[in-house]
Amino acid sequence: MIIRSPEPEVKIVVDRDPIKTSFEEWARPGHFSRTIAKGPDTTTWIWNLHADAHDFDSHTSDLEEISRKVFSAHFGQLSIIFLWLSGMYFHGARFSNYEAWLSDPTHIGPSAQVVWPIVGQEILNGDVGGGFRGIQITSGFFQIWRASGITSELQLYCTAIGALVFAALMLFAGWFHYHKAAPKLAWFQDVESMLNHHLAGLLGLGSLSWAGHQVHVSLPINQFLDAGVDPKEIPLPHEFILNRDLLAQLYPSFAEGATPFFTLNWSKYAEFLSFRGGLNPVTGGLWLTDIAHHHLAIAILFLIAGHMYRTNWGIGHGLKDILEAHKGPFTGQGHKGLYEILTTSWHAQLSLNLAMLGSSTIVVAHHMYSMPPYPYLAIDYGTQLSLFTHHMWIGGFLIVGAAAHAAIFMVRDYDPTTRYNDLLDRVLRHRDAIISHLNWACIFLGFHSFGLYIHNDTMSALGRPQDMFSDTAIQLQPIFAQWVQNTHALAPGATAPGATTSTSLTWGGSDLVAVGGKVALLPIPLGTADFLVHHIHAFTIHVTVLILLKGVLFARSSRLIPDKANLGFRFPCDGPGRGGTCQVSAWDHVFLGLFWMYNAISVVIFHFSWKMQSDVWGSISDQGVVTHITGGNFAQSSITINGWLRDFLWAQASQVIQSYGSSLSAYGLFFLGAHFVWAFSLMFLFSGRGYWQELIESIVWAHNKLKVAPATQPRALSIVQGRAVGVTHYLLGGIATTWAFFLARIIAVG
């Protein structure tokens, strides 16, 4: 009889003490690469050090080791996020007028930074109301704090300290899970377990605990605040949690406890889990009871989703089975093989996640103004504009990142020998049809959308307004968009009988919410001007997609360079002696895609900024007459290129240009400085490497003459490095210019 040892119940998924902690190694620059660790011969060394420090693929080809490094780096990232959050809360506690703002949010602006007087910069401390002098902030933190029920600066202090503790914990975890207990590759590849934990844990329990916090703490505190009770008189959060009678005074059904839940008499909870739609007329934000209901519903969905995948118990879905079953009559092998790709190539996985996160970030941008979630957010125009702009830029960058990592996957991780007739292979085989059609769409959109504007500029110059495309002459109404708006406006009582108001006031109708004499939100009319600019959006988005998709689909090979995969992700040209092959690497497509992403997002935020100032934001008189900031000039002015230049860029830049000597003068300086940074980029983008190498050599000659030549030989930037420096300064300069322009304008007039 053979006696077998019993099977271990739990699989050991970590290695103990795999890598010793060595400060000596960390202190040696480039310890991850034999070449770089030798130290610098030329100045190119410092660029290679930066380029490769986080390119874990180049340090080792062992997927387990790469996975551990990425995992550990994520903890470092979380630590930095907690540190940043702690800093934000600390500023709120130590340097802000939060308590004053809380007592009168319609007349007092949010500020959490007071400039010290050293050489006269105290001019930046403007009067934000209530006798407080500081820099007006537009981050939306005050509104979030009020929505979460924070009523004092002491609470902000405590939260800041808590975030610091978490930052330290994350740093420790990053070290621990690389040096002490590092997960095995199998753990990183166990996607079912990962899905269950992330869905049920992070999203499910995360939403549930937030819903719980909202019901037990935020709602009662905000009830009191909305009624005008002094924050100091309001019971503290723990009193609401521990004393049910306090809550029952505000929401009588609380007295019944969990009985309605177990007797399925759920409508009893409708007081604090509501389904109202629209905005709270006191704060101009969504009803917090709607938000609590939403998070509870989301929590239940994700808790169910987190129990769908098969792990130790042999029941539930397997991702591999789902993907392999996913094929249609025209898609060959369908998603067969995708499971292997996504569990062995983190670039492929990251690409997918970046594309989805980037898209949802842009969705967030569009919801923050149309369904403003926090109290008094809607009347803080600077914050509204900042949040929209911020989320648009972030979304754009994430989507370009998706294309970048898709291309890296194609070059480094794609194995054409094992992939046949699955969806990816089929897309690659008809890439010429895809790219040429997309190119045609771009040309069509570009000529037609720009052509409409040029027509209008010409007719305007010839004094023929009756021949222009406009709401008062030849109309091009966005009838489909208007139909969508109307459908949503009519939804309460039709398709959504339970709702009292439509999801957003922007859809239409006659409702207007004003808070403290300022418009929070009203129906947004769409007309010919919007039709024109939306086609510019379509054009710029399609060109961005064309560039990025071409980079991905031709990353491994093309007719011009059949062996492109051997040259890697980034290379300047296909070697000397082969002209006309520069700027074809996958990296160069990302480089070019960034410029078009910048174009696309710029037009979007310009459209938003002007449209809101013209048709939404403004003041309302006692008689109910609305006066918009720019008096509704969008519909007639934005239909010509000249109108955009004259009535938007030039007219609205007057605040930033004339900001000197006022508390907004920092924006004037940033406006100037960021223009300079942007112009500086052109020096890198429009200049050849040889020019600089010649210049450097004559400078080195002079140093040798004076016997002050350094041991490290100076070198001109490589072609790729020069373009990287160029695009970085182009984007940072452009974004900072826009930021200064927007904020100086909206803080002055909003």
UniProtKB/Swiss-Prot annotation:
Keywords: 4Fe-4S, Chlorophyll, Chloroplast, Chromophore, Electron transport, Iron, Iron-sulfur, Magnesium, Membrane, Metal-binding, Oxidoreductase, Photosynthesis, Photosystem I, Plastid, Thylakoid, Transmembrane, Transmembrane helix, Transport. Gene3D superfamilies: Photosystem I PsaA/PsaB. It catalyses: reduced [plastocyanin] + hnu + oxidized [2Fe-2S]-[ferredoxin] = oxidized [plastocyanin] + reduced [2Fe-2S]-[ferredoxin]. It is a multi-pass membrane protein. GO terms for cellular component: chloroplast thylakoid membrane; photosystem I. InterPro entries: PSI_PsaA (IPR006243), PSI_PsaA/B (IPR001280), PSI_PsaA/B_CS (IPR020586), PSI_PsaA/B_sf (IPR036408). [4Fe-4S] cluster binds at C573, C582. The keyword Flavoprotein does not apply. Its EC number is 1.97.1.12. It comes from the Eukaryota. Belongs to the PsaA/PsaB family. The PsaA/B heterodimer binds the P700 chlorophyll special pair and subsequent electron acceptors. PSI consists of a core antenna complex that captures photons, and an electron transfer chain that converts photonic excitation into a charge separation. The eukaryotic PSI reaction center is composed of at least 11 subunits. This is Photosystem I P700 chlorophyll a apoprotein A1. It comes from Liriodendron tulipifera (Tuliptree).
